[in-house]
Amino acid sequence: MPRRGAVPKREAVADPVYGSKMLTKLINQVMLDGKRSVAEAICYGALDIVRRKTGREPLEVLEQAMKNVMPIVETRPRRVGGANYQVPVEVRADRRQTLGVRWITSFARQRPGKSMKEKLAAEIMDAANGVGGAVKKKEDTHRMAEANKAFAHYRW
């Protein structure tokens, strides 16, 4: 079976309002059923709430939140001699960003009540302050990698 070359990575287009590629990725993650305009309204509304509540530039708060959420190491399962080991590996920069955005949106969705823009704003502000579900997920991921450091020599 012939193999075709690797598919080239597509560059994300910066969003029209803030000119941020990270915000485009957040919008894409929030989007459900291809409804981009709804996702944009949610994200821009959330950033407006962040601006009102913190008095800071919302993109700065989002950048800080992403820094606090993006994992440096994660564990990947590796089968060795009939046993599965969780092997700690470093996370690539693009995956780091993807995981950060994914965790922020998923933990925002899990928050009780209110509208999605309020939940997303709350999760972004919590992450920027170093608390919240997404930051806890990152810490758990790092703790798991630290606990399995003994299997680091199985890295591939």
Swiss-Prot record:
GO MF term set: rRNA binding; structural constituent of ribosome; tRNA binding
GO cellular component, one term: small ribosomal subunit
Swiss-Prot/TrEMBL keywords: Ribonucleoprotein, Ribosomal protein, RNA-binding, rRNA-binding, tRNA-binding
SUPFAM superfamilies, per database record: Ribosomal protein S7 (SSF47973)
Annotated GO biological process: translation
Pfam entry (one): Ribosomal_S7
HAMAP family xref list: Ribosomal_uS7_B (MF_00480_B)
Cited function: One of the primary rRNA binding proteins, it binds directly to 16S rRNA where it nucleates assembly of the head domain of the 30S subunit. Is located at the subunit interface close to the decoding center, probably blocks exit of the E-site tRNA.
Record family assignment: Belongs to the universal ribosomal protein uS7 family.
Subunit composition and interactions: Part of the 30S ribosomal subunit. Contacts proteins S9 and S11.
Protein name (database record): Small ribosomal subunit protein uS7
Gene source species: Desulforudis audaxviator (strain MP104C)
Gene name of the record: rpsG
